[in-house]
């Protein structure tokens, strides 16, 4: 197909353009496309492309309009003709990949996304877009961890890529169930979006729903209804004062504070830290792990809290629990090298060698 397009273009160039170079048709196509009159836009862009064999932009716009109409075969033909005009265009190559994805030609899509995302000479913004497309392709193949890393790479390339934050939000909310991270990611996406319809959905539906879910989760914790923050703060202060002089009494103060207010970070953290050394039975270990989880729920951006919790879980032979703590930590800060290194170690301990290699490769990029 592509060879035929190149041959046709060559003949057209030899013949030369007539007095009508398609500029008027292109202008009408632009106006129709802006008004979402897609059928008219297609006809106008098609006419512009036919009249000017070197009009690259008309061919790209024709491909986009056909995509919007769901005419994928026509879109593929249009983008191939655009690439024939400008074989070096990374934008056209990325569009070719996105159209191939819609046509379920995943091999071509994968190759196109890799070509663009790995080309260091290209603008970072374009490479970031290719990374997001690659992540979507990986999600289609249920390669969740690979998609996650691709989205992290997309953000590193362009922190203003709304689509990357948007897809990270969905991953955090729907796959990993990390609503606190999802809230941050959707908020970031909403600040960067230019599509008013999608922005409205995120700001008026998605974000309020997550906030309400987090509020209900906190309110549903045992003891939350009758919490006494003032008494808990006083007991935490007393516990901290006794930490070196009388560790046993200090631990008792933290336990009392935690009972008074399960939503206090200081109380949950103090309880978990003071009991982690002596927790041996399954019941004691579970209690400490719950306290660590309560602590990170209150300070979801504290990498130290996650790592301390994960190390305790590893010491008590709970690597799956450690993996979850660290995965949640990375949802908030995927560029923390210490957390990433511990995550790789934990994955290897779980026998997840392929995943460990994936995250280790990402760590080396930082």
Report the location of each language-model feature.
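Helix-start (N-cap) detector for alpha-helical repeat units in TPR-like alpha-solenoids
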Residues: 21-25, 56-57, 90-91, 123-128, ...
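Structural signature of tandem alpha-helical TPR/SEL1-like repeats
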Residues: 34-44, 69-81, 103-115, 141-150, ...
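Structural marker of alpha-solenoid helical repeat scaffolds
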Residues: 51, 85, 119-123, 157, ...
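Terminal, low-structured helical/coil segments at or just beyond the last alpha-helical repeat
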Residues: 191-248, 341-366
